[in-house]
């Protein structure tokens, strides 16, 4: 398979420092809003990268569920591989690839668990099918056949046919406290624009990076 000639030019326009918000969360929200308005597929999908005890990196796609001045929030099974890795090393990075807009956002920071109240509030807002799936699946565990998972789901569906579904103790969220956010905008002739926001105490330093 020949891959060397697969390329394209970036022509959506550049990014200048004067166009950036002073706060990176404000800038991120602007870009996210534009990604949603452009009807991108899964605009809140992000790559979440963690490392295990041996320094081996792992990545997976997770949906962003909230972002504010306190950080970026996602939810997962607390018995999953990523949750175990974050228990060992809370350092984390997030990546949003908004290809149709020729944009990327890369975030580094530290993950911390959400409170039980925060978990309950979000879990109760999910569709019932998603709640059942969260309980049925022991994420990252080995299973011999899909039928086992489907059988457990149907069993739970019957069990909770009436009434509320309790928040499982092994399910919850993480908040990523941001250390840095990089905004990348594709440019002509591979002269891309990159701006890095780095947290310095209560302020943000902004640097342009070479592409």
UniProtKB/Swiss-Prot annotation:
Residues at which FMN binds: 60-65, 75-76, 81-82, 104, 139-140, 184, 194
Catalytic activity: pyridoxamine 5'-phosphate + O2 + H2O = pyridoxal 5'-phosphate + H2O2 + NH4(+); pyridoxine 5'-phosphate + O2 = pyridoxal 5'-phosphate + H2O2
Pathway entry: Cofactor metabolism; pyridoxal 5'-phosphate salvage; pyridoxal 5'-phosphate from pyridoxamine 5'-phosphate: step 1/1; Cofactor metabolism; pyridoxal 5'-phosphate salvage; pyridoxal 5'-phosphate from pyridoxine 5'-phosphate: step 1/1
Enzyme class: oxidoreductase
Record: residues binding substrate: 7-10, 65, 122, 126, 130, 190-192
EC number: 1.4.3.5
Cofactor binding summary note: Binds 1 FMN per subunit.
Family annotation (InterPro entries): Pyridox_Oxase, Pyridox_Oxase_CS, Pyridox_Oxase_N, Pyridoxamine_oxidase_dimer_C, Split_barrel_FMN-bd
Role of this protein: Catalyzes the oxidation of either pyridoxine 5'-phosphate (PNP) or pyridoxamine 5'-phosphate (PMP) into pyridoxal 5'-phosphate (PLP).
Protein name (Swiss-Prot/TrEMBL): Pyridoxine/pyridoxamine 5'-phosphate oxidase
Organism: Vibrio atlanticus (strain LGP32) (Vibrio splendidus (strain Mel32))
Phylogenetic placement of the source organism: Bacteria, Pseudomonadati, Pseudomonadota, Gammaproteobacteria, Vibrionales
């Amino acid at each position: 398979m020949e891959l060397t000639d697969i390329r394209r030019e970036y022509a959506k326009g550049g990014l200048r420092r004067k166009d950036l918000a002073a706060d990176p969360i404000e800038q991120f929200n602007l870009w996210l809003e534009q990604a949603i308005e452009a009807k991108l597929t899964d605009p809140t999908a992000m790559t979440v990268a963690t490392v295990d005890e041996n320094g081996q990196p792992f990545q997976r796609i997770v949906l962003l569920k909230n972002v504010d001045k306190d950080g970026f929030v996602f939810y997962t099974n607390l018995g999953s591989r990523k949750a175990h890795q974050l228990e060992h090393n809370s350092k984390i990075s997030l990546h949003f690839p908004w290809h149709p807009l020729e944009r990327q956002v890369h975030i580094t920071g530290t993950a911390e668990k959400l409170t039980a109240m925060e978990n309950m509030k979000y879990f109760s807002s999910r569709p019932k099918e998603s709640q059942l799936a969260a309980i049925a699946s022991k994420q990252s565990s080995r299973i011999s056949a899909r039928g086992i998972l489907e059988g457990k789901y149907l069993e739970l569906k019957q069990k909770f046919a009436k009434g509320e579904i309790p928040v499982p103790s092994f399910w919850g969220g993480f908040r990523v406290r941001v250390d840095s956010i990089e905004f990348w905008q594709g440019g002509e002739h591979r002269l891309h624009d990159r701006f890095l926001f780095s947290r310095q105490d209560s302020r943000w330093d902004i640097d342009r990076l070479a592409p």
